[in-house]
């Protein structure tokens, strides 16, 4: 029996105070087990995370998946002792003495002020440097409700130039039932993995020699273009003017925009005629340059410029993930040039647009989560300007009736932002849309954008950076996993396959496909030498929404036997089927 995803996933929480304590405590138990089994192992850090925990080690030999089971057994043996978790507060010198043989702990301790105290947690004979909190006792941990899941590489403090560590991940829950539900979720996630489904469905492939770049095949590019055309139409209806800006722009522009100082490490650089250039990591400076090419009036505002902008970012190879984290991608990017008084109405308008688009792709209002991200430590602009930007966005949220989670310090370097995450079938969050308030980029200190106000004086516009789905590549990866490759008819690269029952009906199958294609439907005829049942299996494996079976009866009646992806088979005339399918596409129906 398959996993009933909707029923099971909603039972689980990613995080809670109780789960964090339990998982944090198990990270300590795992560290004790690893040091017992592999003497000489040095400890780094081990926090709780969504759905589980991890610990980073420097072991005396490489660890592999075969080591996970013995570590689990050792952890259960430690838990059977039932030791309490006991906190001890110590001075910095005392902590350094206690961890004299642990170089990573020593580095952490040395970063603490000499006058500060630190906390240690003891559990039996094991001691770790830790803020806590933990469960009171190992008896509070169900020894059958956790599992070690994987081993990966990691760098100390995330620095690629630092020591390489071994990271062991685990998942932990309050009950065995929750553990088993989570593991079934993970099995389902593996079946839906876009890195497997994408190539299997003929959508794309990835090349190890060219990491972070996607090769789109005909079916995948059909899906890509369908999404792009839909978004283009929606943006046009909402008052956006589409533009296109250069892929390569000079260092001087990136310096003035502030990207050169804040983002240069992630930019691809090139030189020509003794000048430095960069492949654009984002589109905003180009849109400002378009805005500046003529005198703008307050009557021109708000001005909404959109672009399917090709961007590149030099992401670390270890962070690349299928089509969801790549080095070359296209964004449904747009910038709204407006007055400060127009911020609230434009944010409200954008939120309506975003909800409409997400609904068409199959994400209801309750599957959208909003995060309000405020000023980060590394930023441009003064605090007074940031105060105005954050206040304006907060007022816009109130006007739009948005409830949101507050995320201090997670804003863009030039302004605060709202981030919109989609909750997929497996209850995972995917950050997609964003709208960001920017007083910095258009300022005279940066790109110097101006308009003439009602008072006939020059004023600086506010820029709202916004995207609905973000990277098209990433969004397609999300859709593949959300639908398991079984796309709604309007998105399916092939909407129907015509299958003849015997070679005698190949010509009619081709006729049916031609007629339906002429009505702007994506239909193919399978004229291969395979038997009918093999053709049906192939089409089902490719998750085609409709199979159209044709034989003697269908030829005589000029009909097709329609076999939808779900539901019974029935006969329809060609005109009736095309009308039926076109209605599905027009309404963007989610089911065949």
Curated annotation (Swiss-Prot):
Query: Under what name is this protein listed?
Result: Threonine--tRNA ligase
The entry's keywords? Aminoacyl-tRNA synthetase, ATP-binding, Cytoplasm, Ligase, Metal-binding, Nucleotide-binding, Protein biosynthesis, RNA-binding, tRNA-binding, Zinc
Citing just one GO molecular function, the answer is: metal ion binding
Cofactor binding annotation: Binds 1 zinc ion per subunit.
**Any Pfam family matching the protein:** HGTP_anticodon
User: Which cellular component, as a GO term, is one annotated location?
Assistant: cytoplasm
Query: What ranges does the record give for the region Catalytic, renumbered to this chain?
Result: 193-488
- What is the predominant subcellular site recorded for this chain? cytoplasm
Q: Which CDD domains does its entry note?
A: ThrRS_anticodon, ThrRS_core
Which reaction equations make up its catalytic activity? tRNA(Thr) + L-threonine + ATP = L-threonyl-tRNA(Thr) + AMP + diphosphate + H(+)
Q: What class of enzyme is it?
A: ligase
Q: Which cofactor does it need?
A: Zn(2+)
Residues that hold Zn(2+) according to the record = 284, 335, 465
